[in-house]
A protein has these predicted regions:
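Flexible "cap/lid" loop of the alpha/beta hydrolase fold
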Residues: 97-140
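Active-site loop/oxyanion-hole signature of alpha/beta-hydrolase fold enzymes
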Residues: 51-90, 254
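Short beta-strand/loop motif that positions the catalytic acidic residue
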Residues: 202, 208-210
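Conserved alpha/beta-hydrolase "acid-adjacent" motif
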Residues: 215-221
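Conserved HGGG/HGGXW glycine-rich cap/lid loop of the alpha/beta-hydrolase fold
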Residues: 5-62, 85
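Short beta-to-alpha linker loops that shape the active-site pocket of alpha/beta-hydrolase fold enzymes
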Residues: 54-58, 118, 240
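Hydrophobic, aromatic-rich cap/lid helix
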Residues: 170-195
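Catalytic active-site module of serine/aspartate enzymes centered on a nucleophile-bearing elbow/loop
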Residues: 231-262
Length: 262
């Protein structure tokens, strides 16, 4: 792992692998770089110099006292600048929101990929009443499993059967380590407002990725986001949901890799 310092001095770690055009990967909630991208990095590194970062508070990265979206943007910007040239930037889940906003702050993003970031252009994000507060109570009680489980069922709308499978996998323990970061991200996500006017002249070529089996709200958000970003298109991943990096790595790499290499 390598590391750069963010603007507030926090070390942000990233795995660098492969050779070719630079590709920065930003993971979503409950994950770190390895949990999110372990199955696709070995394929992507054949074509790109991959920098897969651990967002603050996870993995080998540090954390800070004052969490905010701005801090997240500073972190991603630091990794982008470490490449020394324009990069391809990809974000998944909450990482897609971070990647999109970071792209407004630099001229060093060549292309952008966004996979189900929950970025809605017409309304604020609404979670089931009391969900975030219940997760905070779990966290205060030391019940990390309750935090992550509630996130999966109430926010991601994962079925109880799928959650049971996820809990049986070794990477569930890694997700539990990151449980403390989930409520704070949900507060940021809930307060975020997408202003279409800020993106009216946004010309970075953008791929908006959505799984065919993902909820209709994700498809609606993708359509609205594509309408708001002038140089964008939608890629629907057949038979997939929110985590094609795990469920169909080859399909994911083919779709994303072709876009960034074109």
């Amino acid at each position: 792992m390598e590391a750069v310092k963010s603007r507030d001095g926090t070390p942000i770690a990233y795995e660098r692998a492969g050779s070719g055009p630079p590709l920065v990967l930003v993971h979503g909630s409950t994950s770190d770089h390895d949990t999110a991208y372990r199955y696709v990095i070995p394929m992507l590194e054949r074509y790109f110099t991959v920098r897969a970062l651990d967002r603050r508070g996870r993995g080998d990265s540090g954390d800070g006292l004052d969490y905010s979206l701005e801090r997240e943007l500073d972190d991603v910007m630091a990794v982008i600048e470490s490449a020394g040239e324009p990069v391809n930037l990809f974000g998944h889940g909450f990482g897609a929101l971070v990647a999109l906003e970071a792209s407004l702050r630099t001229a060093n993003v060549r292309k952008l990929g966004l996979y189900e970031g929950g970025i809605t252009t017409s309304r604020s994000t609404v979670y089931p009443l009391g969900t975030v507060e219940r997760m905070e109570s779990f966290l205060e009680a030391g019940n990390r499993d309750g935090v992550v489980g509630t996130f999966m069922t109430d926010i991601i709308t994962m079925s109880t059967d799928d959650l049971s499978v996820l809990r049986s996998q070794p990477r569930w323990l890694e997700r539990l380590k990151n449980a403390h970061t989930i409520p704070r991200e949900l507060h940021v996500d809930r307060d975020y407002r997408f202003d279409t006017g800020r993106f009216a002249n946004f010309q970075v070529p953008t791929l908006i990725v959505v799984g065919e089996r993902s909820p209709e709200s994700d498809h609606a958000d993708a359509e609205a986001l594509a309408a708001a970003l002038p140089n964008s298109r939608i890629e629907v991943l057949p038979g997939q949901g929110h985590a094609a990096m795990h469920t169909s790595p080859e399909l994911f790499v083919a779709a994303v890799g072709d876009f960034f290499l074109d």
